[in-house]
Amino acid sequence: MKTFTAKPETVKRDWFVVDAAGQTLGRLATEIASRLRGKHKPEYTPHVDTGDYIVVINAEQIRVTGAKTTDKIYYSHSGFPGGIKSINFEKLIAKAPERVIETAVKGMLPKNPLGRDMYRKLKVYAGAVHPHTAQQPQELKF
């Protein structure tokens, strides 16, 4: 018996919607990253993108534990000398709530072209409304 290897053209991808309201950031992000990679499927193959599409709603209602609201800092750099910028969780969730979940999940995916393809299947929205109703996403609870 030969080992099964998934082919990119035969992969079946489903759409799922996840409600982030009241969820813990890290625990939700690990589940989403695992689903984006396709590790929950029996036909998972490391070098093929077998993951599903994930739509996250209510990103503005995500929570973190402890004092991370003020202590967790996100850094970005322009590439120029002295071009480092920082913003804490509290300000980022008020400014761009989608980026909090996107950053957490992106850090859990592979840092290569395949990981970038997986990341493109993640859709995050601050409120409860999303434009992907035509795909008929199934509700996913963690």
From Swiss-Prot:
InterPro entries: Ribosomal_uL13, Ribosomal_uL13_bac-type, Ribosomal_uL13_CS, Ribosomal_uL13_sf. One of its GO terms (molecular function) is structural constituent of ribosome. The keyword Ribosomal protein applies. Pfam families: Ribosomal_L13. It comes from the Bacteria. GO terms for cellular component: cytosolic large ribosomal subunit. Keywords: Ribonucleoprotein, Ribosomal protein. GO terms for biological process: negative regulation of translation; translation. PANTHER family: LARGE RIBOSOMAL SUBUNIT PROTEIN UL13M, RIBOSOMAL PROTEIN L13. This protein is one of the early assembly proteins of the 50S ribosomal subunit, although it is not seen to bind rRNA by itself. It is important during the early stages of 50S assembly. Belongs to the universal ribosomal protein uL13 family. Part of the 50S ribosomal subunit. This is Large ribosomal subunit protein uL13. It comes from Pseudomonas savastanoi pv. phaseolicola (strain 1448A / Race 6).
